[in-house]
């Protein structure tokens, strides 16, 4: 098994979402001895935004790109190759102002490429990143699960489904800023979510 772990928190090793993602990866490795793990920390190695120059590079035929355009597309190619090779994708996601971190959005923009990770057909779009399990580890200071304030779940469900990844499991550590007891309970609840996701 090839496991791709994406850490999107700006807090590095102090990140709660990374802590939960690590727990998922540990369980996967325990049940799949010999699994290979690739870890990408998006805050420590930030990916450039999808700006006008990047769009220009992507829409320029490969044989007509400038060296700068070729280098820009190559950055995205690395991320695409990582997720194409993965059997399981584990993503640590904190909640920042009710959305996902900008570094995670940049990663999503990088891996979403027409004719590579999705395509348009006569019947509509078709995702090409199929047969992958996705585990999303959320860490939140408050409690927003199953409420209108949770914009993360519908967004990630939509974009991953668009890319062909429909086997998506969500793990929640919520209430982390609501006191020590609440934080302890949050991690216990996350472990229960992990057990259910891997059952």
UniProtKB/Swiss-Prot annotation:
It is an enzyme of class 1 (oxidoreductase). It comes from the Bacteria. It catalyses: 2 a quinone + NADH + H(+) = 2 a 1,4-benzosemiquinone + NAD(+); N,N-dimethyl-1,4-phenylenediamine + anthranilate + 2 NAD(+) = 2-(4-dimethylaminophenyl)diazenylbenzoate + 2 NADH + 2 H(+). Binds 1 FMN per subunit. Gene3D superfamilies: 3.40.50.360. Keywords: Flavoprotein, FMN, NAD, Oxidoreductase. Pfam families: Flavodoxin_2 (PF02525). Transmembrane segments: none annotated. Its EC number is 1.6.5.-, 1.7.1.17. Disulfide bonds: none annotated. FMN binds at residues 9, 15-17, 95-98. One of its GO terms (molecular function) is FMN binding. Homodimer. Quinone reductase that provides resistance to thiol-specific stress caused by electrophilic quinones. Belongs to the azoreductase type 1 family. This is FMN-dependent NADH:quinone oxidoreductase. It comes from Aromatoleum aromaticum (strain DSM 19018 / LMG 30748 / EbN1).
